[in-house]
Amino acid sequence: MFAVVRVRGPVNVSGKIEDTLGMLRLHKVNHCVFLQDTPNNKGMIQKSKDYIAYGTVDVESLTEVLSKRGRLEGDARLTDEYVKENSEFASIASFAEALVNDDAKITDVPLLKPVFRLHPPRKGHAGIKRTAQQGGVLGNHGDDIKALLNKMR
């Protein structure tokens, strides 16, 4: 499962890339989505790699984002009680584990919003014009996406 965070804004973005970001539901900066590892998603990520940060997410990071930033329709917080009452999962942690193992989808919890609005990163980004390999924040972070998600908790 991939965590994808939009890092750059809408100015001077080509129409095709803006459409791709719209299909990924990344309409605003600091928004995050979690995507399954499919060829379609990989292609959209590759196309918009100059405007997003992405990487493979682990269970702990996903649990933290779901519990702190997960919202239901009506802007109510996602809680363990809601997950237990309205889905087959016992808690947010078990739901996150099932998501990482591709045994579940975000839509398995009813009314859960698929976009997570993150806080701007504490101490700022390393640079939004350079890739992660060049010392910036754009592109593929691999397993190190958890550090970015922790900064934006």
Curated annotation (Swiss-Prot):
This is Large ribosomal subunit protein uL30. Belongs to the universal ribosomal protein uL30 family. CDD domains: Ribosomal_L7_archeal_euk (cd01657). GO terms for biological process: maturation of LSU-rRNA from tricistronic rRNA transcript (SSU-rRNA, 5.8S rRNA, LSU-rRNA); translation. The keyword Ribonucleoprotein applies. SUPFAM superfamilies: Ribosomal protein L30p/L7e. PANTHER family: 60S RIBOSOMAL PROTEIN L7, LARGE RIBOSOMAL SUBUNIT PROTEIN UL30. Part of the 50S ribosomal subunit. InterPro entries: Ribo_uL30_ferredoxin-like_sf, Ribosomal_uL30, Ribosomal_uL30_arc, Ribosomal_uL30_euk_arc, Ribosomal_uL30_ferredoxin-like. The gene is rpl30. One of its GO terms (cellular component) is cytosolic large ribosomal subunit. One of its GO terms (molecular function) is structural constituent of ribosome. Keywords: Ribonucleoprotein, Ribosomal protein. It holds the Pfam family Ribosomal_L30.
